[in-house]
Regions:
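C-terminal PAP-associated
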Residues: 39-392
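Sec-dependent, cleavable N-terminal signal peptides
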Residues: 1-46
Length: 392
């Protein structure tokens, strides 16, 4: 959800850090965990809880409420972003997790510069993205994300997007309002409410853009029809639920579907109810056909420990084994019953999509002990103390 405005100077954002950590771990677990899923239990259980309190999925198939194919974005009105003063936007609901804030030794601190690993990591090109303020919201966090495609780089900053030529850095389209992607679509998607996601489906060479809308009960997703982000898009509106607020959508690309996790709150945003995984029929969405969304329902207590889930996102050229599930990873607690563990699930949608689906807790790898920075306190900045860092 969009948040209050932020000054131009940099700030530390735990939410961005959380997304980066979980996304990286999710891909790693997806690659190492293929052999774990065949015999795993279909019940996600919190350690120490009795069998009678085990969580069980309540599967639901939800059809897209509307879909169409857009005109080429380069030919549509881009709904330019007028300059506005900094302003307040609604705060996100707070999960309310109590984190341990005391210091402890870092058992896996990096003491040497990884020159051998960075030798081949040389930026091919470096250029400025969307300029400040560049978007209407000026929100904190700005939910900045972007992806590299075959010939383009697309960046999102709450509430705008811009398409760049990745070879020259020249702007091809924008910056423009994300809502303009849904111009002429009708309904709530034309007035989205933030938390945008931009991904590049490397398997199909297509773009994915999303944001939520409709009082945090709708997820609007568009899939480009080619590798050109300025062309036409297959657009969808999914109603993810009712009687609750669905926040913090995070999406991953997988061969058999687009996977997503959201945090779920009561309608007033005062109580965290749990996390909920979803899967979208990727095959239908790539073809521009009416599509379905599949969910095992809310993963609340005792299965979820009030920590967000992150689906794995495929990047690379080596596909996972046929039928391999998508891995969802829960951020580890620094205290509590999920102590220093990346609790993990495998989500399988079946073939064809929606046939005998499973959402399964699997053996979870350990996490090194750590202290959660700025425990439970958003919008805080930490200044680096370079002089105190070890040099050998």
């Amino acid at each position: 959800m969009k948040k209050r405005s932020a000054p131009r100077d940099a700030f530390f954002n735990p939410r961005v850090l959380l997304g980066f950590v979980l996304g990286s771990v999710g891909v790693a677990l997806a690659l190492i965990g293929f052999g774990l899923y065949p015999g795993a239990s279909v019940l996600a259980q919190k350690p120490g809880q009795p069998t009678t309190q085990q969580w069980q999925p309540k599967w639901e198939v939800i059809h897209s409420s509307h879909n169409d194919v857009s005109a080429p974005l380069r030919e549509m009105a881009t709904w330019d972003l007028p300059p506005v003063s900094e302003h307040e936007a609604p705060e996100n609901p707070q999960i309310g997790i109590v984190r341990e804030s005391g210091s402890r030794p870092d058992t896996v601190v990096q003491k040497t510069f990884a020159e051998t690993l960075l030798a081949d990591v040389i930026p091919g090109f470096n250029f400025d993205g969307i300029p400040y303020p560049g978007v209407i919201c000026n929100c904190a966090p700005p939910d900045t994300n972007g992806e590299v495609g075959a010939t383009q780089y697309v960046q999102i900053v709450n509430e705008g997007y811009q398409v760049f030529d990745k070879a020259t850095g020249n702007s091809i389209l924008g910056p423009a309002s994300i809502n303009s992607v849904w111009a002429g679509f009708g309904g709530v998607c034309q007035a989205g409410q933030g938390d945008p996601v931009m991904l590049y489906d490397q398997i199909a060479n297509r773009w994915l853009i999303s944001q939520f809308a409709g009082g945090l009960t709708h997820e609007c997703i568009a899939i480009s029809t080619t590798s050109d982000a300025t062309g036409t898009w297959n657009r969808y509106d999914f109603t993810v639920g009712a009687g609750a607020l669905f926040d913090y959508p995070k999406i991953g690309v997988w061969p058999d579907g687009y996977y997503m996790a959201m945090n779920v709150f009561n309608t007033s945003g005062t109580a965290y109810l749990g996390t909920q995984p979803f899967a979208f029929d990727r095959t239908k969405m790539l073809a521009g056909q009416p599509a379905t969304m599949l969910t095992p329902g809310l993963v609340g207590s005792p299965a979820n420990n009030e920590d967000p889930l992150m689906p794995a996102d495929f990047d690379g050229s080596i596909l996972p084994p046929s039928g391999a599930p998508n891995t969802f990873v829960e951020f580890p607690d620094s205290i509590g019953n999920n102590l220093n563990t990346y609790r993990s699930w495998h989500y399988s949608v079946g073939v064809p999509f929606g046939t005998n689906p499973t959402f399964t807790q699997v053996p979870s790898p350990a996490a090194a002990p750590f202290t959660f920075l700025f425990a439970g306190v958003p919008q805080r900045r930490r200044e680096p103390a370079w002089a105190t860092w070890p040099t050998a």
